[in-house]
Amino acid sequence: MKNKKTKILVLYAMFIAIEMLLVFIPFLGYIPIGPLRATTLHIPVIIAGIILGKKGGMIIGLVFGLSSLFYNTISPTVTSFVFSPFISGSILSAIVAIVPRVLIGFFAGVIFEQFCKHKWNQYAGIIISGLVGSLANTILVLAGIYFIFGQSYAQA
């Protein structure tokens, strides 16, 4: 029992370390494309959801969300007001920065668990979890921007 807890703790530490490396190594986690930043930070969150389950994916997703909030605060671009309440003055920015990222790990974990539970093809479960996690990030962030900051974002 003790070895399993240690293994889980080490996996959490590794995923958090990977997230932090992606955040702080230039052009690796955040890729500047004009005034926007594409991200690869959702990839470890999806993998954590698959390996550690929905709870683990949500925890690593929280790290992604908090790092997004932090990074957009210390290194702002034209659109950083959407992800940082310190720039926009609205706590709703924190919701856009954190909630979709937490849900990436949740969705990836739930879908993979369902594939394993029903004894379906595990490789298909990994692929579909990855696709759904990536789409969840994109759709939920864009929906948050549209519904909360639609007018302001259009002007930026």
List each language-model region with its residue ranges:
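Loop-helix junctions at membrane interfaces
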Residues: 1-156
